[in-house]
Amino acid sequence: YIDLLDINAEISLIGHSLGGIFLAKYLSENTFIRQIRALHLIAPVWSHPESILHNTGNFSFEAKNLKKISSQCDEIHIWASRDDDIVNFEDSEKYFEYLPKSEMHIFGHRGHFLQSHFVELFQTFL
């Protein structure tokens, strides 16, 4: 599907939960076809190869390789809620630590961001 992208359109990528770790792994190991305007990691699972709480499958990555992401993205947004009962809040803090040019958006009562409306995310596209 990447081949079908309009080469003149701005690209923003959004990964939620396991989708977040998928994008982190992909972008830390590969160079995307062009510059990414914004990367949004919403309640992303951190790479826990030893964890029984999260089966990250083949999505585990080397944290030191995350620096490759920063050069491919104009903006990096990490979205986390302190009351997330599926992914630990600390997972998002780890991404923030390893992605120094990222912006972290912290909420207190959004859980795992399963609501049908996410106005704050939408506003970043305006």
What role is predicted for each listed range?
Residues 85-91:
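Conserved alpha/beta-hydrolase "acid-adjacent" motif
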Residues 110-120:
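Catalytic histidine-centered segment of alpha/beta-hydrolase-like enzymes
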Residues 39-49:
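Active-site nucleophile loop of the alpha/beta-hydrolase fold
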Residues 61-75, 122:
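Conserved serine/cysteine hydrolase catalytic core
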Residues 14-24:
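Gly/Ala-rich beta-loop-alpha elbow adjacent to hydrolase catalytic centers
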Residues 12, 37-40:
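Residue in the alpha/beta-hydrolase core beta-strand immediately N-terminal to the catalytic nucleophile
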Residues 72, 77-80, 84:
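Short beta-strand/loop motif that positions the catalytic acidic residue
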Residues 6-16:
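Alpha/beta-hydrolase fold nucleophile elbow
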